[in-house]
């Protein structure tokens, strides 16, 4: 029995097998590259107690979540840099942020700060203010309950 060979001297059955192996190796390689890239971009979430007990390496991007401690919010002379303390009832972490703060960012409110540790201070690049289920946007604050319900009904 004499099998026909493809133009390159490889049997068609073996040629398909070689192509399958090459495709599989390329797919695995792409998956490993994607996993490596994502692991370097991931921001781990910490609460102050976890951050104090097990700090990440300096300069690693993380998220810090907790409550802005009352009496800790201070604005620097430049007018856009603020210092405050984030706590979780067990530990406190000083935070520095330069930029415009979210409207809901006030002392005693929840916050998620994205940034990195520099020494003992967390330097935030971004602030996300958290609110409770009773939040009412500033624009809706002057509306009556019936008007607010009508607006909500329109969005459903």
Curated annotation (Swiss-Prot):
**Side of membrane Cytoplasmic, spans:** 1-16
Question: Which Cys pairs are S-S linked?
Answer: none
Lipid bilayer topology: Single-pass type II membrane protein
Q: Which GO terms describe its molecular function?
A: heme binding; metal ion binding
Spans traversing the lipid bilayer: 17-37
Please name the InterPro entries in this protein's record. CcmE (IPR004329), CcmE-like_sf (IPR036127), NA-bd_OB-fold (IPR012340)
Alphabetized UniProt keyword annotations? Cell inner membrane, Cell membrane, Cytochrome c-type biogenesis, Heme, Iron, Membrane, Metal-binding, Signal-anchor, Transmembrane, Transmembrane helix
| Annotated compartments | Cell inner membrane
- On the tree of life, the source organism's domain of life is Bacteria
Under Pfam families, the record lists:
CcmE (PF03100)
Quote the cellular component terms of the Gene Ontology held in the record: plasma membrane
Any one biological process term the GO annotation gives: cytochrome complex assembly
- Residues annotated for heme binding in this entry: 131, 135
> Topological domains (Periplasmic): residue ranges?
38-156
Family classification: Belongs to the CcmE/CycJ family.
Protein's job: Heme chaperone required for the biogenesis of c-type cytochromes. Transiently binds heme delivered by CcmC and transfers the heme to apo-cytochromes in a process facilitated by CcmF and CcmH.
Please report the name of this protein according to its UniProt entry. Answer: Cytochrome c-type biogenesis protein CcmE
Q: By which gene is this protein encoded? A: ccmE
């Amino acid at each position: 029995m004499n099998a026909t060979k493809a133009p390159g001297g490889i049997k068609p059955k073996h040629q398909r097998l070689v192509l399958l192996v090459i495709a599989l190796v390329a797919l695995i390689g792409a998956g490993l590259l994607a996993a490596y890239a994502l692991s370097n971009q991931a921001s781990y979430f910490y609460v102050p107690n976890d951050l104090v007990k097990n700090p990440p390496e300096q300069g690693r991007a993380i998220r810090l979540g907790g409550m802005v401690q009352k009496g800790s919010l201070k604005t620097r002379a430049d007018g856009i840099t603020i210092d405050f303390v984030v706590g979780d009832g067990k530990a406190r972490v000083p935070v520095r942020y330069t930029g415009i703060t979210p409207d809901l960012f006030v002392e005693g409110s929840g916050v998620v700060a994205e940034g990195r540790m520099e020494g003992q201070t967390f330097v935030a690049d971004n602030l996300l203010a958290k609110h409770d289920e009773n939040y009412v946007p500033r624009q809706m604050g002057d509306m009556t309950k019936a008007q607010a319900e009508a607006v909500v009904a329109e969005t459903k």
